[in-house]
Each structure stands twice: as C-alpha cells, then as structure tokens.
A protein has these predicted regions:
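Terminal, low-structured helical/coil segments at or just beyond the last alpha-helical repeat
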Residues: 1-7, 13-17, 189-227
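Residue-level detector of the short coil/turn that links helix A to helix B
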Residues: 13, 47, 85, 117, ...
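Short coil turns that delineate tetratricopeptide repeat
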Residues: 30, 64, 68, 100-102, ...
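Start-of-helix register in tetratricopeptide repeats
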Residues: 34, 68-72, 104-106, 138, ...
Length: 227
C-alpha cells in the first residue's frame, strides 16, 4: 500500500470521526447553526454532496428567522453545489447573498473556470465578484491574470497595479506585471528582480513563459523581410 493511499485512508477516517462528533453536537444542541455548517463542510470533503445538500436545506428551514445565519448557510449550500460542479445551482445560491458572501462565492467560480482554462467565463465571474468587493486583493489578481491570459495587456496592467498597491510584496503579481510591461515595451526588470526576491519558486516556474514572451517581443520588433 502506498503512502498516499494510507494518508487518504487516514484523512477519511478522521473526517468520518468528525462527522460522528458533529452529529452528536447537533443532537445535543439543535440550535447550533455552526455545527450544521461544519458538518456540511466535512461531508463535502467526503464527497457526500447529497447528504450535505439535505443537511443545509434542513438548516435553512430551522434558522429562517436569523438573517445572518441564513446568509452563511446559503453560502455553504452554494459551496456544496460548487464542489459537486453543479455551477448553475451554485450561482443560484450565491445570487441571493449579500455583498460579503456573494463576492467570495463568485471568486471561487472565477478561480474554477480559470483553472480549466476558460478565461472569458472566469473573467465574467471575477468582474461580478469585484462589484461586491472592489478592493479585494485576490479578486483583483484573478481579474489581472485572466486579462493577461486573454492578451488584454493594458487592462491587465491596471489590475496588477491595484494588486501591488495593496501588497507590494506579492511576488506572483510582481512577476506577471513584469511580463505585461515586457509585452508593452515598458521597463520591466525591476518587477522581475522583486519577484525573484519575494517568490523565487514562482519566478523559477515562470521562466518558460518569460522565454516565450521574449521571443514574441523580439519577433514583433524585428523588421519583416520583403516577400
């Protein structure tokens, strides 16, 4: 048996033990909304999506007179659908939330689509998230990364600048901002120097992208030979 398989089995056993404890907590304190939320989270970890959905639907009925609790439970239900990759239902839940929870929900959707290479859809969800949390660093960075992937360098630069204004020690953003500057024919070396200091792992991983962009920039600047 491999180490990874042993670790997975240990994690599963731990989660199942946690389920047992949280069920007991709910039985003892049926008015503890956090216990429902935490139990649903553990069920999602176990990929028991139908059980998590049923639990949170029940909790929404029990705590319907507590608006703040309903927000959290609805966000949890959106997470269940998100984890199960039922995005239409996740969106339906996130749409009903206040700005704080809605922004977090839509940011997750944006990150998921980005991971799958669907940058246009990711950008749409990131933009919606940004409407709820315009100064959120993670949301601004997702906006910038998708704009970069789509080749919209001018707008990507604006969003990276906002990210770096909030956190100048973000090595990931420093490196990507350098790539944008390189394509735009602007000074870029300072960004790469900072990125190497702040996030050497990301800097090393980005070397292929850097080489590709350098070749692209050189090709754009080289005079074309007459046919």
């Amino acid at each position: 048996m491999t180490e990874k398989k042993i670790d997975r089995q240990a994690d599963k056993a731990k989660s199942e033990q946690l389920v047992h404890q949280l069920v007991q907590r709910i039985d003892t304190h049926p008015g503890d909304a956090d216990a429902y939320y935490e139990l649903a989270t553990v069920l999602v970890d176990l990929k028991s999506y139908a059980q998590a959905e049923e639990l949170l639907m029940k909790a929404l009925g029990l705590f319907d007179a507590q608006p703040a609790t309903v927000e959290k439970l609805r966000y949890g239900l959106g997470n269940v659908y998100y984890a199960a990759q039922d995005y239409p239902k996740a969106i339906q839940q996130f749409d009903q939330l206040n700005d704080q929870w809605k922004g977090a929900g839509y940011l997750m959707l944006a990150q998921s689509y980005m991971a799958n290479g669907d940058h246009k859809r990711a950008l749409a969800f990131a933009l919606t998230a940004l409407g709820s949390q315009p100064k959120d660093e993670a949301t601004l960075q997702v906006m910038a990364e998708n704009l970069l992937a789509l080749g919209n360098m001018a707008q990507a630069a604006q969003y990276y600048d906002q990210v770096l204004a909030l956190d100048s020690k973000n090595g990931h953003a420093q490196f990507d901002r350098g790539l944008v500057a390189m394509v735009q024919g602007e000074p870029y070396q300072d960004y790469f120097t900072r990125a190497k200091e702040l996030d050497p792992i990301y800097f090393d991983k980005g070397q292929k992208r850097l080489a590709d962009i350098e070749r692209f920039v050189q090709a754009q600047r080289s005079p074309k030979k007459p046919q």
